[in-house]
Curated annotation (Swiss-Prot):
GO CC, alphabetical: extracellular region; protein-containing complex
Chain positions recorded as Ca(2+) binding sites: Q96, D98, E104, N119, D120
Protein name as annotated: C-type lectin PAL
Superkingdom, natural source: Eukaryota
SMART domains on file: CLECT
Naturally occurring in which organism (per UniProt): Bitis arietans (African puff adder)
UniProt cross-references to SUPFAM superfamilies, sorted A to Z: C-type lectin-like (SSF56436)
One of the record's GO molecular function terms: lactose binding
Subcellular localization: Secreted
Family indicated by similarity: Belongs to the true venom lectin family.
Keywords annotated in UniProt: Calcium, Disulfide bond, Hemagglutinin, Lectin, Metal-binding, Secreted
Locus of motif Galactose-binding: 96-98
Protein purpose: Galactose-binding lectin which recognizes specific carbohydrate structures and agglutinates a variety of animal cells by binding to cell-surface glycoproteins and glycolipids. This is a calcium-dependent lectin. Shows high hemagglutinating activity (MHC is 0.25 ug/ml on rabbit erythrocytes).
Length: 135
């Protein structure tokens, strides 16, 4: 585990919640600038979702939803991760994703679900965000 003290180590990667509110693209840009190879976080199994949810509940200072690295680049419900990893696991909140008013193409962790479930949201909304890095 080479993660810095305030990062969560999991499956060879390190995760950190940032409370500063940013639009989705700005959040992804922030993660990338933090260190080469960093992105908004991607998830590949239920266990990861639970561990991240617990970590965010413990460390997130605020009520904001939290951006992750999933987005619908083509705007056709074909969700992709910014780290180009395989979209092999999805855990949507009830009745989501819905592309509400054809404007929601970025994905957030929903605070009311304890950050366990996902919602598609307007990419320009300001949220906290979760970066994932290799150190």
């Amino acid at each position: 585990n080479n993660c810095p003290p305030d990062w969560l180590p999991m499956n060879g990667l390190c995760y950190k919640i940032f409370d500063e509110l940013k639009a989705w693209e700005d959040a992804e840009r922030f993660c990338r600038k933090y260190k080469p190879g960093c992105h908004l976080a991607s998830f590949h199994q239920y266990g990861e979702s639970l561990e991240i949810a617990e970590y965010i509940s413990d460390y997130h200072k605020g009520q904001a939803e939290v951006w992750i690295g999933l987005w619908d680049k083509k705007k056709d419900f074909s969700w992709e991760w910014t780290d180009r990893s395989c979209t092999d696991y999805l855990t949507w909140d009830k009745n989501q994703p819905d592309h509400y008013q054809n404007k929601e193409f970025c994905v957030e962790l929903v605070s009311l679900t304890g950050y366990r479930l996902w919602n598609d949201q307007v990419c320009g909304s300001k949220n906290a965000f979760l970066c994932q890095c290799k150190f």
